[in-house]
């Protein structure tokens, strides 16, 4: 009886831990624009403090969604690393490039990078401007969209 109670308690507690889930490209649908997520370089994901996962086909969709919902309820913010297609990286620590030379699914020309040197390499080749997570939030707040 004690073992069953322990197991049930463990399952309940572990089930609520905010954990990312892999994006299923070609199957998952964007929580913001409802498009099917297919681009492995520009996808994104947020996880609520209760463990619910929302996936996005573009970083700009995630930024707009978070702005509409309020960031307080989210535990994790993740973005695809442009240099490692399909790999998710911490969106709050990522470096972002807005460059007309690198189109993104929703037309904001926004790409995320797991580290600044990679972002600078692509910036040198394609042009554009670099931003931090907080700078993207500020830009979205000033414009009303991204």
What residue ranges belong to the model's regions?
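Post-signal-peptide N-terminal segment of Sec-exported extracytoplasmic proteins
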Residues: 31-71
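Short metal-coordination and nucleic-acid-contact micro-motifs, chiefly zinc-binding Cys/His arrays
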Residues: 26
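Sec-dependent signal peptide recognition
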Residues: 2-7
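A short, exposed loop/beta-hairpin motif centered on an aromatic-Gly-Thr core
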Residues: 108-111
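Bacterial signal peptide processing site
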Residues: 17-19
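C-terminal partner/receptor-binding element of secreted or periplasmic proteins
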Residues: 114-146
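C-terminal motif of bacterial Sec signal peptides marking the signal peptidase cleavage site
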Residues: 12-15
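Mid-chain, structured segments of secreted extracytoplasmic proteins
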Residues: 61-101
């Amino acid at each position: 009886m004690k073992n069953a109670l322990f197991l049930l308690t463990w399952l309940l507690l572990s089930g609520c831990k905010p954990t990312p889930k892999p994006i299923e490209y070609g199957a998952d649908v964007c929580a913001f624009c409802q498009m099917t997520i297919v681009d492995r370089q520009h996808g994104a994901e947020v996880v609520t403090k209760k463990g619910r996962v929302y996936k996005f086909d573009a970083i700009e969709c995630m930024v707009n969604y978070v702005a509409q919902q309020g960031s307080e309820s989210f535990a994790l913010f993740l973005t695809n690393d442009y240099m490692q297609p399909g790999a998710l990286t911490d969106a709050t620590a990522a470096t972002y490039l807005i460059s007309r030379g690198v189109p993104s699914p929703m037309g904001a020309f926004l790409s995320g990078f797991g580290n600044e040197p990679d972002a600078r390499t692509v910036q040198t080749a394609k042009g554009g401007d670099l931003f931090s997570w907080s700078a993207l939030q500020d830009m979205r707040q000033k414009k009303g969209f991204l």
